[in-house]
């Protein structure tokens, strides 16, 4: 029996029950779930193991000591000690006192794969909100080299809605090239679109990193990871990084597979395309296979070099607390936020509307199921079931999920190191979302 730790506010007990059940029913390894409602934290749960295989943390070295966050402080003011670290870890911080796997604690962070896209998407929307970026402008206005190979008419909004026609690379990058900051932008700038930009959509699984990252660098003069740190993470007090500092490596949970990850899958009985995403992935010529294989071989996500890279498609590292707080801040003020901007609220009403107004819908040329995107965010639907019609956010391949629902006034995040085969509706995340829905309905009855 896994010892689930943390707190839930009255009425949210179903979330705790669902979280505990995930370990028994779905083979959960280590995970956390956090829910904010009306700017206040009402669920904060964690359990399982940080190093499921009993191995070392991603850095293979010593623990990170005082574990300071992006603000330079050791921990969030509202955090309560989850366990006595001296009892649960040995001197190098890798294993429990009994020599077994290290337990997941309240400050454990995790690589969240494509959940990163939802954090990264806030950057161009905030730049637009501040008058620095025209969403209806051409990408080549800011990045002249990008107009090559028939891409001169690609708009910024096409990029955010997965409509550029560049979800693949004719010549995949090596893991080293993917993180060098030069090869990726150069490759997508030279790539010929596989459909007429703006006429269709398909999930830019890997190329989103270099498309969005380079656009932000051209507009701001800063890397996207630095922009997120300076404009979002520090003001809001988030333990969230795109480009993990070396001193934070000891906090990161080690990824372990719950089931084979040989091919992506879209979970759920409602997803019945003529050709499944798993079948498409097995075809080496399919857009599905080529999109996910834009980096070949796939990088080791436990590798320190990967953790340190700024890959806005997949490389973010965060706690569940940080992601839930981030989404809560997109839609409403946070009383404890350390920023004067709108009491901690990030999106103005008009920006929030743009984030969740449908830009792309229907058959996805990569995922081969029907998907819905706003500007940078997946929207509620069969491929990405969230809380309700107004929800927006992003799942990550393998299970993690984070989103906001303005009508319910919530920010939700679930992170896991037990990677299941899947791109969209992971059964563990969906069990938690259903429990949130049940809890909210009971409170309003």
State what each model feature region is:
Residues 51-102, 266, 335-342:
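Intrinsically disordered, low-complexity terminal tails and inter-domain linkers enriched
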Residues 102, 106, 111-115, 119, ...:
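Active-site helix/loop module of the DD-peptidase/beta-lactamase fold
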């Amino acid at each position: 029996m896994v010892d689930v730790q943390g707190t839930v506010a009255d009425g949210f007990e179903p979330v705790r029950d669902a979280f505990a059940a995930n370990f028994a029913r779905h083979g959960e390894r280590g995970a956390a779930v956090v829910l904010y409602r009306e700017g206040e934290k009402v669920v904060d749960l964690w359990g399982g193991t940080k190093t499921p295989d009993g191995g070392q943390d991603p850095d293979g070295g010593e623990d990170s000591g005082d574990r300071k966050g992006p603000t330079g402080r050791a921990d969030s003011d509202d955090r309560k000690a989850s366990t006595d670290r001296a009892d649960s870890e040995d001197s190098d911080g890798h294993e429990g006192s009994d020599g077994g796997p290290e337990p997941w604690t309240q400050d454990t962070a995790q690589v969240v794969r494509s959940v990163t896209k939802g954090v990264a998407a806030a950057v161009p929307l905030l730049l637009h909100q501040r008058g620095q970026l025209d969403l209806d402008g051409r990408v080549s206005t800011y990045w002249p080299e990008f107009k090559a190979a028939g891409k001169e008419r690609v708009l910024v909004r096409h990029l955010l809605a997965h409509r550029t026609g560049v979800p693949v690379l004719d010549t995949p990058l090596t893991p080293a090239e993917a993180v060098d900051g030069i090869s990726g932008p150069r490759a997508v700038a030279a790539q010929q679109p596989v459909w007429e930009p703006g006429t269709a959509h398909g999930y830019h699984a890997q190329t989103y990193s270099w498309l969005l990252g380079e656009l932000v660098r051209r507009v701001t003069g800063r890397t996207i990871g630095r922009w997120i740190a300076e404009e979002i993470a520090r003001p809001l007090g988030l333990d969230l990084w795109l480009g993990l500092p070396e001193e934070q490596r000891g906090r990161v949970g080690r990824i372990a597979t719950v089931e084979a990850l040989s091919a992506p899958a879209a979970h759920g009985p409602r997803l019945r395309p003529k050709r499944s995403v798993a079948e498409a992935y097995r075809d080496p010529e399919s857009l599905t296979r080529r999109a996910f294989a834009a980096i070949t071989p796939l990088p080791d996500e436990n590798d320190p070099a990967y953790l340190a890279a700024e890959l806005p498609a997949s490389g973010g590292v965060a706690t569940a607390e940080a992601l839930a707080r981030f989404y809560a801040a997109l839609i409403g003020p946070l009383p404890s936020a350390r920023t004067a901007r709108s009491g901690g609220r990030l999106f103005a009403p008009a920006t929030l509307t743009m984030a969740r107004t449908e830009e792309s819908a229907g058959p996805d040329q990569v995922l081969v199921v029907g998907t819905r995107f706003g500007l940078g965010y997946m929207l509620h639907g069969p491929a990405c079931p969230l809380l309700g019609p107004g929800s927006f956010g992003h799942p990550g391949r393998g299970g993690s999920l984070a989103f906001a629902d303005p009508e319910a006034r919530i920010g939700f995040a679930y992170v896991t190191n037990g990677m299941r085969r899947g791109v969209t509706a992971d059964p563990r995340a969906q069990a938690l979302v259903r429990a949130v829905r049940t809890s909210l309905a009971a409170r309003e009855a």
